[in-house]
Amino acid sequence: MIRSNSKCTPSWGDAVIHTAPLPTTTPSHASDHSRLKLFSGSANTALAQEIARYLGIDLGPMVRKRFADGELYVQIQESIRGCDVYLIQPCCRPVNDHLMELLIMVDACRRASARQVTAVIPYYGYARADRKTAGRESITAKLVANLITQAGASRVLAMDLHSAQIQGYFDIPVDHVYASPVLLDYLRSKNLEDIVVVSPDVGGVARARAFANKLDDAPLAIIDKRRQAHNVAEVMNVVGDVKGKTAVLVDDMIDTAGTILEGARVLRREGAKEVYACATHAVFSPPAIERLQGGDFEEVIVTNTIPVPENQRFPQLRVLSVASILGETIWRIHEDSSVSSMFR
């Protein structure tokens, strides 16, 4: 197997940006590369094809279909006995269908005597249901972890989990990787001046601080929401100096875009000269598109962990590819090499 080391010319338009591959590892021992098999579910075949190109292999043949009653069917079309299998499937909309498809793929591989089955989940659905906030609720993120484990997965590879503690919901190894290298490279390419990294809420401070530290130790600001009394609107304050600066709002996902839009408006009110939104997962539930293209952002920067269809594209949107990060991680897992060293 040969990984591509050629650099792709970046395109900063609406199209997906193919970033240069990360530094590759040198295998410490010979291995049978024919034992690495890559398959894709139906959730994001474009990303899976990019990962396959990075690794220099083809996606494995697989039949997927839906019966008249709605049941899903999956069949692996080649022998995977004794192989290390990687199944690429983000649990994005429709979440339940894609999750069930992943479980069926994992089970099919286990029953086909695969040596190892790694569920590659660029976007982990139900991640926000990571704890009980009221009585008689499910901790659905834990339930999903149980389902994936019981289906027969040997390992999980996930990107930018909403809560890092989700790794502990699994009784199998979890490799948690980050989209920050491609996001940071893109921001650096723009040569922005007077950058301040902003967390849209208190819960995202650790994520924003880590991002700021890697962005040339940029200063950090926090948007703090407070409700003074019942039936009184929330008051939003900015902790930190943003006046005359280029504000980069950093979050793990953009869903309905309500939080990040409110953040942009309060930053403008406090004197920020430009506002960029930066997130890994483009969930984009209605009315996100209307909110994001309203002129409050210079750019909205996301990645392709979730496919963004043409009808959700707008002039300010930039979609970056994380295929090189996921591809390199798969290679390192297969070669028993360090994954964490990619993000130091």
Predicted segments with their positions:
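PRPP-associated nucleotide enzymes
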Residues: 1-344
